[in-house]
């Protein structure tokens, strides 16, 4: 699908959809429980990735949507051999692999070749050391065998999803386990989200300093009464649209959330945008003057990389995104693909091994570009229409559905001139 977005002034308000990250975790914890759960503020068909996890956990629980709530009823029996299509969802794959092995399920994960080219060696190494089967091909992964309690080493700077997957699975094992974090942990807010969900399900863990998490075995998940937060990662695109194109007011967000991507508001303030908290708990972001460049540590906020690139593309001065190397292992090689996608529409970007340097121009020229089939790059390019002299034409824009089925509709509602 190709999207054409004409230069647009932005003004309006929207309610931010439920958090993809929070929804993944709530689905998994509730499906592992011994008693029924209720997940509040549920929006069905919010994104491809959440639907992947929802379909997968239906192997362990029956799911029923009543009004705005998802009720989860655990099954007493489950199949010992499964095939699960994870499409392009790295979160689903990395969360589910340890859980399947905790139950001793033989499982074949299918999906896009692009997904199976992303890093998975953390699990492959552990499964080999534990004597379990782990067969990795270009379009699938097959695992079999019973995971047992042990000490598991995880690289801190690769993806927190490996750590979260183990955190979900290890309480089900017979005996205590330790997760040893090798190096400094990046994306820690995502780990904190997992621990928060586990606590809601009465699962106990103990963190020893910053590098060891002890997970007690022989635990049972309790049913949860859980309200899914709105998505700060998704809100960042609309916040940036307001800062560049006029004004946006965002509803539904928890300003005390542990989601790391709420940092977007601090970034916008430091760059010179107006950010105000309203009495009705909404947040308004207004364009002031041209934004200012900034040095930004990307360690805990890699998913903000694309939209920060949009902000920096026309900021005054040079923006430096450092500790950005993990962007190479997302839905695309985001460092090189961001450089390519934004250079095509007039941005001045350079990348090195661990940094992205963006020298701001006054306006983007627009033109034809591509998302590289990366949902966050596609949405970031769409927002760039607010500072473009000409239409921005995005190839592979269907990738947006990976994280949001209604982004285009909401973007139009605040003034964006989108042509499908």
Swiss-Prot record:
Residues the entry annotates as binding phosphoenolpyruvate: 20, 90, 118, 161, 334, 376, 402
Molecular function, one GO term: 3-phosphoshikimate 1-carboxyvinyltransferase activity
Catalytic reaction(s) noted: 3-phosphoshikimate + phosphoenolpyruvate = 5-O-(1-carboxyvinyl)-3-phosphoshikimate + phosphate
Residues where 3-phosphoshikimate binds: 20-21, 25, 159-161, 187, 303, 330
Localization per record: Cytoplasm
Enzyme active site: 303
Record bears the keyword Cytoplasm: yes
EC code(s) of this entry: 2.5.1.19
One GO cellular component term noted in the UniProt record for this chain: cytoplasm
GO biological process: amino acid biosynthetic process; aromatic amino acid family biosynthetic process; chorismate biosynthetic process
Taxonomy, superkingdom: Bacteria
UniProt entry keywords in alphabetical sequence: Amino-acid biosynthesis, Aromatic amino acid biosynthesis, Cytoplasm, Transferase
PROSITE patterns in UniProt: EPSP_SYNTHASE_2
UniProt pathway annotation: Metabolic intermediate biosynthesis; chorismate biosynthesis; chorismate from D-erythrose 4-phosphate and phosphoenolpyruvate: step 6/7
Enzyme class: transferase
Family: Belongs to the EPSP synthase family.
NCBIfam families listed in its UniProt record: aroA
Role of this protein: Catalyzes the transfer of the enolpyruvyl moiety of phosphoenolpyruvate (PEP) to the 5-hydroxyl of shikimate-3-phosphate (S3P) to produce enolpyruvyl shikimate-3-phosphate and inorganic phosphate.
Assembly information from the UniProt record: Monomer.
Protein name listed in UniProt: 3-phosphoshikimate 1-carboxyvinyltransferase
Organism name: Brachyspira hyodysenteriae (strain ATCC 49526 / WA1)
């Amino acid at each position: 699908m190709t999207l054409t977005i004409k230069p647009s002034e932005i003004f309006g308000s929207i309610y931010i959809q439920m958090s993809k990250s929070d929804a993944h975790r709530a689905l998994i914890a509730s499906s592992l429980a011994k008693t029924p759960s209720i997940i509040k503020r549920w929006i069905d068909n919010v994104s491809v990735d959440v639907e992947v996890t929802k379909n997968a956990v239906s192997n362990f629980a029956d799911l029923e949507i009543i009004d705005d709530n998802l009720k989860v009823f655990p099954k007493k029996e489950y199949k010992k051999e499964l095939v699960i299509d994870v499409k392009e969802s790295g979160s689903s794959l990395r969360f589910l692999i340890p859980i399947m092995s905790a139950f001793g399920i033989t499982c074949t994960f299918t999906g896009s070749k692009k997904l199976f080219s992303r890093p998975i060696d953390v699990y492959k190494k552990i499964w080999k050391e534990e004597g379990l089967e782990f067969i990795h091909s270009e379009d699938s992964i097959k695992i079999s065998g019973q995971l047992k309690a042990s000490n598991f080493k995880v690289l801190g700077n690769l993806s927190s999803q490996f750590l979260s997957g183990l955190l979900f699975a290890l309480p089900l094992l017979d005996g205590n386990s330790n997760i040893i974090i090798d190096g400094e942990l990046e994306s820690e807010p995502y780990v904190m989200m997992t621990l928060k969900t586990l606590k809601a399900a009465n699962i106990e863990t103990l963190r020893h300093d910053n590098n060891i998490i002890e997970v007690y075995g022989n635990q049972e998940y309790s049913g949860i009464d859980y309200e899914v937060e709105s998505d700060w990662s998704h809100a960042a695109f609309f916040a940036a649209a307001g800062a560049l194109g006029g004004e946006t007011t965002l509803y539904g967000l928890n300003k005390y959330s542990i989601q790391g991507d709420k940092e977007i508001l601090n970034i916008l303030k430091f760059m010179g945008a107006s950010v105000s908290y309203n009495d009705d708990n909404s947040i308004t972001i207004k364009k002031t003057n041209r934004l200012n460049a900034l040095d930004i540590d990307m360690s805990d906020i890699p998913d903000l990389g694309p939209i920060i690139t949009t902000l920096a593309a026309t900021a005054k001065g040079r923006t430096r995104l450092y500790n950005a190397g993990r962007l190479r292992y997302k839905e695309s090689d985001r460092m090189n693909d961001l450089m390519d996608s934004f250079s095509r529409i007039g941005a001045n970007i350079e990348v090195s091994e661990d940094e992205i340097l963006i020298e701001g121009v006054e306006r983007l020229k627009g033109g034809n570009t591509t998302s590289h089939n990366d949902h966050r790059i596609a949405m970031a390019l769409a927002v760039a229409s607010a500072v473009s002299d000409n239409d921005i034409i995005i190839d592979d824009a269907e990738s947006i559905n990976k994280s949001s089925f209604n982004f285009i509709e909401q973007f139009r509602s605040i003034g964006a001139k989108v042509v499908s």
